[in-house]
Amino acid sequence: MEAHQFIKAPGITTAIEQAALAAANSALANAVVVRPFLSRVQTEILINLMQPRQLVFRPEVLWNHPIQRVIHNELEQYCRARAGRCLEVGAHPRSINDNPNVLHRCFLRPVGRDVQRWYSAPTRGPAANCRRSALRGLPPVDRTYCFDGFSRCAFAAETGVALYSLHDLWPADVAEAMARHGMTRLYAALHLPPEVLLPPGTYHTTSYLLIHDGNRAVVTYEGDTSAGYNHDVSILRAWIRTTKIVGDHPLVIERVRAIGCHFVLLLTAAPEPSPMPYVPYPRSTEVYVRSIFGPGGSPSLFPSACSTKSTFHAVPVHIWDXLMLFGATLXDQAFCCSRLMTYLRGISYKVTVGALVANEGWNASEDALTAVITAAYLTICHQRYLRTQAISKGMRRLEVEHAQKFITRLYSWLFEKSGRDYIPGRQLQFYAQCRRWLSAGFHLXPRXLVFDESVPCRCRTFLKKVAGKFCCFMRWLGQECTCFLEPAEGLVGDQGHDNEAYEGSEVDPAEPAHLDVSGTYAVHGHQLEALYRALNVPHDIAARASRLTATVELVASPDRLECRTVLGNKTFRTTVVDGAHLEANGPEEYVLSFDASRQSMGAGSHSLTYELTPAGLQVKISSNGLDCTATFPPGGAPSAAPGEVAAFCSALYRYNRFTQRHSLTGGLWLHPEGLLGIFPPFSPGHIWESANPFCGEGTLYTRTWSTSGFSSDFSPPEAAAPASAAAPGLPYPTPPVSDIWVLPPPSEESHVDAASVPSVPEPAGLTSPIVLTPPPPPPPVRKPATSPPPRTRRLLYTYPDGAKVYAGSLXESDCDWLVNASNPGHRPGGGLCHAFYQRFPEAFYSTEFIMREGLAAYTLTPRPIIHAVAPDYRVEQNPKRLEAAYRETCSRRGTAAYPLLGSGIYQVPVSLSFDAWERNHRPGDELYLTEPAAAWFEANKPAQPALTITEDTARTANLALEIDAATEVGRACAGCTISPGIVHYQFTAGVPGSGKSRSIQQGDVDVVVVPTRELRNSWRRRGFAAFTPHTAARVTIGRRVVIDEAPSLPPHLLLLHMQRASSVHLLGDPNQIPAIDFEHAGLVPAIRPELAPTSWWHVTHRCPADVCELIRGAYPKIQTTSRVLRSLFWNEPAIGQKLVFTQAAKAANPGAITVHEAQGATFTETTIIATADARGLIQSSRAHAIVALTRHTEKCVILDAPGLLREVGISDVIVNNFFLAGGEVGHHRPSVIPRGNPDQNLGTLQAFPPSCQISAYHQLAEELGHRPAPVAAVLPPCPELEQGLLYMPQELTVSDSVLVFELTDIVHCRMAAPSQRKAVLSTLVGRYGRRTKLYEAAHSDVRESLARFIPTIGPVRATTCELYELVEAMVEKGQDGSAVLELDLCNRDVSRITFFQKDCNKFTTGETIAHGKVGQGISAWSKTFCALFGPWFRAIEKEILALLPPNIFYGDAYEESVFAAAVSGAGSCMVFENDFSEFDSTQNNFSLGLECVVMEECGMPQWLIRLYHLVRSAWILQAPKESLKGFWKKHSGEPGTLLWNTVWNMAIIAHCYEFRDFRVAAFKGDDSVVLCSDYRQXRNAAALIAGCGLKLKVDYRPIGLYAGVVVAPGLGTLPDVVRFAGRLSEKNWGPGPERAEQLRLAVCDFLRGLTNVAQVCVDVVSRVYGVSPGLVHNLIGMLQTIADGKAHFTENIKPVLDLTNSIIQRVE
């Protein structure tokens, strides 16, 4: 069907009409939808106010303030679209959930009418939290809102929106509030009626009524059911008049939108506000006429809002203009007051002629009429007087001028002014008027009002300047200035007039002088309990922290704070500076914002301010929306117990590490001083000064903690040599030799006892060891180091993180810690544990253990040792315990030397212990293997892939380097060469946003090479030494190099850096844009290396879910942690970073970057702009589209005007059509019915051995009477075309033979040739060209009968669950959704129905050739309509299944065992079968109407029902070369074929038959079965059967057939072996082995159903078909032969019998 054939546009005759039609269509397409019900007057008012915008009225809601709310919604849409992610001032509670783009909302505590608004606010979503806080007076639960008001809130936001919420704030206050927020733009919607400029009174206008009592103005619009606006008059006047704010917070106020007297003001922070004069009311329709007597009292007995009448009256402009024109042009004899009154009465009547308004009229009060008559009469009198006097005096003047002589004229010419200063008439000075005189006029026209007022902000700068000037003036007079204007106390220049450096200065204004906060303060944990709750710290940690105290030494310097926190026996240092990076336990980054002048700091959702008070340092903390205030007294705090401190630090570290492992977002890493410091929870620049290398800093799990070597104050058993200097360029010096304690040989055991701290100072000739944290503690005394014994260890492998594997003795390690293979009790044992005890017996004193981590114990006596406990594999194999044994040794600073834990006495396999160490160690650790373990490692050590650089590759690469070196960009490559050889590398590949770059740590790399400047800047911001490929040629020699986006680097530069580096780690995505040959010299593809990823990362932290699904073809294993489900939007306004594909598009879009430049970058929002010149690029390189789609984290707008991305399968049409059809986001139960394989409880199938295929089919042919057919198919005569219009090709040549690959030459199905052109014509005409018998009747009776099976259906909603099932089905079929188009019925592809012939013929026990019936076809609807109707039909089907009685079975939506049990329970019943002939072809307008009735019951949108009726009632079937235009019928390829065929089948059976002892019924399409004891035809059946032309064939027998199974009451359902074997005989098992394998698997599935019922099936199936049981037995054996893959095939070439003669079309 092509719906466009029923849509016809009217003819357009001229270009003017065409332009007018285009303009009208455009106006309607962009019209404002008005949803409320409106009166006629309200409609006229709204049309006039909204001009020139087109309005579309779709009334569906009742509003209290319809006119204002429509205007409000329009202005709100404009403001939110321009503001983007912003802060909102005074949001309406009902708008909170609808606008997730708002960062923060400022509210005031509700009073009066606001309380009612909060009570009616939504109780779900973000609004619920706000509602709870507002009504219960609770503090905010997060940072997304506050109740401090706009003026007192300090949430940082660049853009703001205020919708009718600034009427109580002066412009100067708003300027200061914006400065406090750091806001540069604020979109404010305000209602500013011009009547507030007038004196108090009651003003009636055409739109609203305004009551002005001098202080407040109340505005009520036409039709309002409750009070309208009520605002302060003086503030409204200020907003009308002000165009700029000057002072410390300058603003420019611009009116960017206006609807009536509703304005959108754009307040922009500008350093020098320029003049911005504006006319606020250029379209005002009223003139305000002043009453000459002024206002009088109100005669009412009841109090009113305004007790006086108006001074001014609003008069329509057309009334006043018409009255002035009439009165000013009357003759002197005709002019009088009564004539004016008569004329005014006439023009005040509204006159309409048909639909044309000839006179608009005016409905005025008596006061207004009196004032207008008086003002008009006096104004005209004054004008007449001027006219008379001007003519009279002018004539006299002319007489004087004409009477002048030559001398007088010469004098006038010489001495009187002329030229530019001459204005005719000025020299006469007829009449001088004053502003307050009556002659100055009686009316005010708002159209002519112009405002440009500047207001100073309310800061004290102006007063300070005045004070300075006044004091200087007094001092100049020699007086002592002691006036009230002297500087306020506590300000710089507090010395008053004596400070000449400040007084009178305009350059250095007075600033608040903050007192020096340096000093020592005591911190008690119980003061910060509110903060611990805000941080969601576990209760045990909070309880421990509350019991502890700390002493903090604070040193303040300009823009810097140094803190030294002493907690028990531990000391921590932090440095607070602006821009410091805070450590985190998740992927988020936190940068500290510190302002010393404001004494504040903040990061993320945490902020604090501090102030020195007499009681101490007062700190106000805001964390996660909750506030905490603490005052830390000066002086020291009592020292905490070391055990308590150690337990607190240990628990805090475990909490941080647990959060880091399991949280997707994480938060601040909470150091001990972050919970017990004066600036919690911040601890920037955390450095530990303690002597205990405890608490796990720098472990494998903490990316941000110190990874330097550990320094301690314990005394070594041996003296050490002088410390070595730190390596240049490294953040921390490496541990010197003097700080390394080794296991002494047994001969030196006597020195172990001397491990006490000496008290003598260090000799002057020795260099003290390097200490990492200033100020350094006093170093211990070191003795001169003796020469170490020769080492015999052998290096086996080095990991990229610096960890090493050695073969040798643990005693040769230089690591800070030694790991002992201990037992759970940490008692001296055997093996390595015994060796440790011999050398370090003190290490086993449990009282000296400083920390326990799990089963591991840490000690510093006599040196750092960790006792680790591995599982005993002799008792139980416990891999988790083995992992934990290594993991528990990582809670330390410095490096550690390990043995293979458990591989000795505990008999843990070497491979398992090694793998556990490999997964749980820290950078720089060492593993020592015994010789047997080393042999295992040599055979299994990890190998890095190798890249072989051949001589040809090196020669070509060097040529490319020479070409590069000659350019300006590549001059750094001069002299660089690549030599042949082998390069080992590590290549981490991953999906976009998988964190490849973030996984690199600064300690792992020296140089980072990146392809673009954008990436270089990103790496440098993270603190890495990053270079572009050419510049990096100078710095990569011998360095550890990481190459980001390696596949996109020029290959010659990639090879150069890989060969020069000491170790190379490649990062990238092989599916993204490869290196581009900009020179087009052909060198790039010639030398591009084949890089093999060593690891693939499949989890993306950037890409939303919809992007992952789009790119899943390139990344089959991609997963995402993003919570954004839908991020791609089409044809919306551009946002964020613009991405283009070509340089031409980049030049046309300022600020855009190409996708090649964007590789590796991450943006919150992006806009992809596809231009026509990128068609070849996108079609040839899908990588460009992948890069563009994977750059954003939240939202991406696609502007695809040429449709390039749609051509590669990137479109949102499916989702748009789904929501257009009324779909909703929600969940239904899935439609998949869980099915399991039958258990072999009987296994009777095993009694049937495989049998001969040929004999089984011969026996089947004998039993059914079928013989070998001489032909492959029969083309029956084509029936007469009874209705519709057939389009057929001129050429109808057909092939006369068919090649088939089959099991037997005897076919047991009807013979047809689906691929023949004449067969297609016969099916088209015979099935869909037959006359449809229409039946006009009500559907109520049939629907009532259908209720026996399907009760009345309630409202149904199509949800995203059904949409997902639709998409899942499309994906399973290999479809990408590109065939789903926008719902445009003028497009033929949207509504096309494609027809093709079925290739499966029907099994029959009768004659296979002489049936003379046409074939069967499939009419596939377009994918657009399938996606449009499919979710609705699936949702309706689910609802029907939920309502069906348990004994009614629908389609395949049931478990087979349940149906079998129901049949088994009906042992005394007979089987009622009904067979329809031409079921689809006989469906007509009545069946279609019944479908529409059911759809209406389900709440389907009416337009969707009408569209379905249109598509079903008139259609065009499009075959490959033929097409048929027809009406009605049913098409088997519709999205609701099974649903509506089954419903129609149920309706016919329920309406036409009545059953006795009804037990079970099953319906599937046109197939049905009912188990009952008797049946009869209903009394209303004949009318329906005859009216619809139904062809029913009823069979009533003990055993029946239904949907491929045999229904045997009392036994159950059994597979139909005869039918299945007969259909196999017709199948073509060729031409390739794939088809044969598919059919073999189908046979296996069928046999699985025979597992337990094979013997019963032999007896029952043979009775149904009247064949011998032996046949069924042989057929089962034959199927087992086929399932075993031993089938025998015959290849036959058979002719096709053509019985067609001509196509006969009936002439109407």
From Swiss-Prot:
Where the record annotates domain Macro, the positions are: 790-936
Q: Where are the transmembrane segments?
A: none
Q: Would you kindly state one Gene Ontology biological process term found in this protein's UniProt entry?
A: DNA-templated transcription
Cite the residue spans of the region called Disordered.
747-792
Does ATP-binding count among this protein's keywords?
yes
Domain RdRp catalytic positions: 1469-1580
Location of the (+)RNA virus helicase C-terminal domain? 1098-1231
Instruction: List the residue ranges of the region (Hinge).
Output: 714-793
Ranges for domain (+)RNA virus helicase ATP-binding come to 949-1097
Activity regulation details: Putative protease: Inhibited by chymostatin.
Q: How is the cofactor bound?
A: For methyltransferase activity.
Top-rank taxon, per record:
Viruses
Which region ranges are annotated with the description X-domain? 800-957
Which intervals of the chain are annotated as region Putative protease? 442-509
User: In the UniProt record, which is one GO cellular component term?
Assistant: host cell perinuclear region of cytoplasm
What InterPro entries does the record tag this protein with?
(+)RNA_virus_helicase_core_dom, Alphavirus-like_MT_dom, DNA/RNA_pol_sf, Hepatitis-E_Cys-pept, Hepatitis-E_hinge, Hepeviridae_RdRp, Macro_dom, Macro_dom-like
What CDD domains does the annotation carry?
Answer: Hepeviridae_RdRp, Macro_X_Nsp3-like, SF1_C_RecD
Q: Where is this region: RNA-directed RNA polymerase?
A: 1222-1708
User: One Pfam family, short name please?
Assistant: Viral_helicase1
Task: Write out the residues that bind ATP.
Answer: G990, V991, P992, G993, S994, G995, K996, S997
Indicate where this protein is primarily found.
host cell
What positions does the domain Alphavirus-like MT occupy? 56-240
* Protein name, per record: Non-structural polyprotein pORF1
Organism encoding this protein = Hepatitis E virus genotype 3 (isolate Human/United States/US2)
